[in-house]
Design a protein with these regions (language model features):
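Solvent-exposed alpha-helical segments within well-ordered globular domains of core cellular machineries
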Residues: 7, 11-14, 23-26, 41-44, ...
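Interdomain "pre-motor" coupling segment immediately N-terminal to P-loop NTPase/helicase cores
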Residues: 10, 14, 18-70
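Conserved, well-folded catalytic cores of nucleic-acid-processing
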Residues: 12-19, 28-31, 46-49, 53, ...
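AAA+ P-loop ATPase motor domain of ring mechanoenzymes
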Residues: 44-97, 101, 240-252
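Conserved P-loop
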Residues: 85-163, 212
Length: 262
């Protein structure tokens, strides 16, 4: 193919924003000639390549906007180390069907058992399914809401936090929440009630949330909305972080839980 012709095709790709095709056009033309592809087969391959490229870009954008603290997958989770977790329940959550019905998810258990890992992994799965996700810690969320309240922008911030189809709130119960923080948290839960899913992790049992929020009445109102349509996963097991410290010799113990092997 002549250079002017190739340049014209590239210009067309630029105008149509077919950036992947523009970059790979010479190779695609060469492969089409070598394989003696029909026009329809070649066009199908071109469009499939561009669709894949755009899907990858959109996934990368959704993942970046979710603000995950790290990226971990379900495949990397050691279910055999945490036998209290039913893998079928987590795999079902990974399908995203709970998002279609607007259900909430509560991951409860002591520190280090993998709650945040599961929350991030489920969030990544949701991103792969085209879902808009936002990850935040409870402390970060309360601080954000408190700042918005002080600046008279609370309603604006609540509208923003109500937009993601999945809001992940990590580490409820790790630090105490004052009365104002509890009230702001309740307003967010109420704003999202039956509008979008919330996934929370907590190291406290639900019965202790009155102490976490410093107000039993507010805690009950929050739980009433979270539990109305929800799936609760209770994790009872050893800490992954403690296991790694034991393996590294930083701690000593008579019983060191070993990771399961195939």
């Amino acid at each position: 193919m002549t250079t002017p012709h190739l340049d014209r095709l590239r210009a067309h790709c630029q105008r149509l924003r077919l950036h992947r095709l523009e970059a790979e056009l010479p190779n695609l033309l060469e492969q089409a000639a070598k394989r003696e592809m029909s026009y329809s087969d070649w066009l199908d391959e071109l469009l499939s390549l561009e669709i894949q490229s755009k899907a990858e870009k959109h996934l990368a954008m959704r993942t970046a906007m979710a603000r995950f603290p790290f990226q971990k997958t379900l495949d990397a989770f050691d279910f055999k180390f945490q036998p209290s977790i039913d893998p079928k329940v987590i795999r079902e959550l990974a399908t995203g069907r709970y998002l279609e019905s607007g259900d909430n998810v509560l991951l409860l258990g002591p520190p280090g058992v993998g709650k945040t890992h599961l929350a991030v992994a489920l969030g990544l799965k949701a991103c792969e399914q085209g879902i808009r996700v936002l990850f935040t810690t409870a402390a970060g969320l309360i601080a954000t809401l408190g700042k918005a309240f002080a600046e008279n922008r609370l309603d604006e911030r609540l509208k923003i936090l109500a937009q993601p189809q999945l809001l992940i709130i990590d580490e409820i119960g790790y630090i105490p929440i004052d009365r104002q923080g509890a009230n702001l948290f309740f307003q967010l839960i109420s704003r999202r009630y039956e509008r979008g899913s919330i996934l929370v992790t907590s190291n406290q049992s639900l019965g202790a949330w009155g102490e976490v929020f410093g107000d039993a009445v507010l805690a009950t109102a929050i739980l009433d909305r979270l539990l109305h349509h929800s799936i609760t996963v209770n994790i009872r097991g050893d800490s992954y972080r403690l296991r790694e410290k034991l393996k590294a010799g930083l701690l000593k113990s008579k019983h060191v839980p070993e990771p399961a092997t195939e």
